[in-house]
Amino acid sequence: MKQEQKHTENSSSGIPSILSKVKLLHGDRVLWVIIPILMVISILVVYSSGVKYDTPTGNSTTANLWKHCIIILIAGIALLIAYRFNAKFYRKAAPLAYLGSLALTVAVYFIGDSTNGAARWIDFGFFMLQPSELLKLSTVIFMARQLSMKQKSITTQRLVPSFNPLKWREPAQKKIWIEGTLPVLIPVALSCAIILPAHTSSAMLVGAISIMMMFIARVRWQDLLKIGAIVVVAASLFVAIGAGRSTTIRNRIGTFFSNNEVPLGSKPLNQLTDTEHAIIAIHDGGTIGVGAGQSVMRAKITHPESDYMFAFFVEEYGIVMALFLLSIYAWIFVRAIHIFRHSEWIFAGLLAVGLASLVTVQALLHILVSVDAFPETGQNLPLVSHGGTSMLCTAIALGIILAVSRQIEEGSLIPTDVGEKFTTPTDHNL
């Protein structure tokens, strides 16, 4: 009866009813509309940005377009495959997916190719794989599993042991390590530590999303404060001792603050940073943009097709379309919250919100960099920027969210354990 009521609510929530007649498109109708829109936008802007790399014969732009269309097609197929699996499958597969992506991310430091001084890619000949993207995705799925398994005792279970190592042999501290720290915190710490040397902002993203999921899952606020303190201390030490890409981090932060010291108009054009070129692109775009394919700044920005896609999009299509694009990402998160609140299974709800947050927070970081409100991160615009692994992982994440929404609609989202079932509104912090 409860599932029928939820189905009725979902069907009458202003979602495009025409899609409900399409048998393959069960689940959240809004997401089924949003995702193809983002993919079409991606094809348009990646094609236009590719003119920067064009040759006199024009072959490079066309080849770049076809390559990106193939990536979009593969991503679409991956989304549909992910959509067909049930939440129980993802719960069972989470440990294996996590360990596999962890191993690949470690391997990249030994056999991978470097970009901008950081080992990030494994070259398979026909495809360049970025394992850190897989690890981001699998960590969120694994965290949803671990937190849901702890729901019976989550409000009383301590996750952070004493800061005094001498006490760790005490029975109470051993219990904290075995039941809280090892199953919940260590996987996140491992993911962040392995990603950090090559892609600092991705490690930050994984950590932030994981803490947010802990908050939603009702982890004790005392533990959340301790985790926050540990993160601040660890990050400070990382930068202080010059580990990994800490020099690059310091340089980017320094560039971010120095950009505002000298007025943009008083700088020689050949001394402008990519972010400053992005600001000019946004200014030139104005309300309606300069028109598709008419960008000037794409020739000035190092990676208009990835790192500064939002600025490039605003230049060609204007602020109005940029606001539309922003609303799409915001709506993905809103729909995930809707799915979460209609889920009776804590794992599935955390899965939807965690994956949606991974997409939307990454989009937010990308946009903040483009408007010079945050230091350069190298994060691309999900499902829009050029990038095979990122596109594939984003599509899988959205496919999983759609799978959860489909099961809610079908009434087949049944918790594997009664302890993982929502019983009252106080079972979560969302």
Where are these regions (language model features)?
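Extracytosolic (periplasmic/ER-lumenal) interhelical loops and adjacent juxtamembrane/interface segments
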Residues: 272-291
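Hydrophobic alpha-helical scaffolding
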Residues: 23, 243, 267-268, 299, ...
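Transmembrane helix boundary and interhelical junction motifs in multipass membrane proteins
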Residues: 199-204, 289-294, 304-306, 374-377, ...
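Short linear Ser/Thr-Pro motifs
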Residues: 39, 48-50, 201, 295, ...
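Hydrophobic alpha-helical transmembrane segments of multi-pass inner membrane proteins, especially
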Residues: 32-48, 55-271, 311-372, 396-400, ...
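Long extracytoplasmic/lumenal interhelical loops at the membrane interface
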Residues: 286-320
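A juxtamembrane structural motif centered on a specific transmembrane helix
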Residues: 1-19, 147, 362-430
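Cytosolic juxtamembrane amphipathic/interface segments immediately preceding
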Residues: 12-26, 59, 166-170
